[in-house]
Structure formats: C-alpha cells, structure tokens
C-alpha cells in the first residue's frame, strides 16, 4: 500500500490534486494499493513559510470530489515502513521502483507520475453534483456557442507570498489572451475572468464585449466552471 500521510498539510487544493494523483499513479505503476488518512480532512494544519508567513490548510479533496472518500482510512490503519521524499520539481522515474508500504512526500507537479492512469484520476476528480450545478448556472449562456477561455487572476494569498508565488503581471495575461485571439479568427472567443480580487481584475482588463467576470462564487465553483471552459490561462 502506498500513501501520502501529509496530504492537506503542505499545499491547498491544486497541490493536493497533484499529490493525490501522483500517489495513485505511482501505486498503480508498481501494482500496489493506495490510501490516504481520513483525519486530515477533519483536523486543520498550519502551513509555515519563511519570514513568519503562515496559512491554515485542510485535506479538501473529499469535500469537493466525493469519489476520493473511497480512498480514505484511519491513520492508525495505514502502515508505512519507508519514506520517499521528492528531491526536486522535476520528474523522477525512480519513484516507479519504490517498495510497498512507502509514504510519499513532496509536490509531484508533473502529469508524468499519473498519465498512464489518467482515466482513473479523472474518475476521482468528478466534482460534487451541487458544485457542478452551480458552475453550470454561473457560466454565461452566449448565443452561437463561442469558445470560452478561462483567465485565472490569483492575487489574494499570493500578495503575502511574493517570494514563493509571484503575482502574474498584466503583460503575462495580455500576451496569453493575444495567443488565443490570433489563433483562429473564424471562432468567436470570450474571456471569462476568475479572481479572488475581482476589482483588481476589473481594473486590469476593463469592460469590453469579449470580457466576462465571474463574481460571488465559492472557489470550488469557480474551479469547476474553469474546467468547463474550452481553454485556460492559469495564474502560476
């Protein structure tokens, strides 16, 4: 059995999705099972950064993706005799040779750890029905079925973490948007703006026919709505 005992203690939803997917992918590659601690969904942890910056984190995945709950077990029932620490932010194929009963540690931010079982991962990452319904209702209904490009402008928590997660500047967003605008002139495109600081985003992009702002949604609804767009411009 392969586990990630610290999931929910190092990183929020996006990081947890990579950590979960990598654990499943590595376990499947070596023909082992996988399991995650139930307690991490109930007890908050404090994530520490340099310079005294902290933030509270939970293991959020089961709350948004109900299928993840079938992978949970009490911590005292998860036996691990080995630890495999990710040495860096690149792909390390050596993880496909770890022994059974290994506890993984790291961020594992590459699909190479789980691309061989992508259908299984997508099965786990099916949003809760209520979240899906809210996302579908929140997305604009535009005649002619144009392509929707989500634009994620993340500002809030990154302001205090600039040395780790720089806020992307206007040049990044406008350059990315131009890539889509120039690619196919025969298809109408609308840019759907998602942000944790919508006033900042409005000052950045202004008002125009091709810009739509998503407001007053929970973060998980925004994420689900982003997944329903045809293309995505991410924040980091």
Model-identified regions with their sequence ranges:
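Donor-binding and catalytic core of enzymes assembling or modifying cell-surface/extracellular glycoconjugates
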Residues: 13, 182-236
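Extracellular/lumenal mucin-like low-complexity stalks
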Residues: 1-5
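Histidine-anchored nucleotide/phosphate-binding helix
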Residues: 16-28, 174-181
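A short beta-strand-loop structural module common to alpha/beta enzyme folds
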Residues: 32-43
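Short, charged/polar "capping" segments at the starts of alpha-helices
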Residues: 41-46, 159, 197-203
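Secretory-pathway luminal glycosyltransferase catalytic domains
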Residues: 44-188
């Amino acid at each position: 059995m392969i586990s990630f005992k610290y999931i929910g203690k190092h990183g929020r939803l996006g990081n947890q999705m990579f950590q979960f997917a990598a654990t499943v992918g590595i376990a499947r590659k070596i023909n082992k099972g996988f399991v995650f601690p139930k307690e991490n969904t109930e007890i908050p942890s404090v994530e520490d950064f340099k310079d005294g910056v902290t933030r509270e984190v939970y293991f959020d995945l089961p709350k948004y993706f109900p299928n993840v709950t079938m992978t949970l077990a009490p911590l005292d029932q998860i036996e691990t005799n080995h630890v495999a620490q990710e040495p860096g932010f690149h792909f390390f194929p050596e993880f496909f040779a770890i022994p059974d009963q290994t506890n993984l540690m790291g961020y594992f931010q590459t699909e190479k750890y789980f691309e061989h079982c992508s259908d299984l991962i997508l099965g786990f990452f099916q949003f809760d029905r209520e979240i899906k319904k809210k996302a579908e209702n929140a997305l604009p209904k535009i005649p002619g079925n144009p392509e929707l490009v989500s634009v994620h402008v993340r500002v809030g928590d990154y302001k205090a973490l600039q040395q780790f997660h720089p806020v992307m500047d206007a040049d990044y967003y406008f350059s990315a948007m131009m890539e889509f605008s120039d690619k196919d002139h025969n298809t109408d495109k609308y840019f759907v703006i998602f942000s944790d600081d919508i006033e900042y985003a409005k000052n950045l992009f202004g008002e125009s026919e091709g810009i739509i702002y998503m407001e007053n949604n929970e973060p998980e609804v925004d994420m689900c709505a982003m997944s329903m767009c045809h293309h995505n411009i991410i924040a980091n």
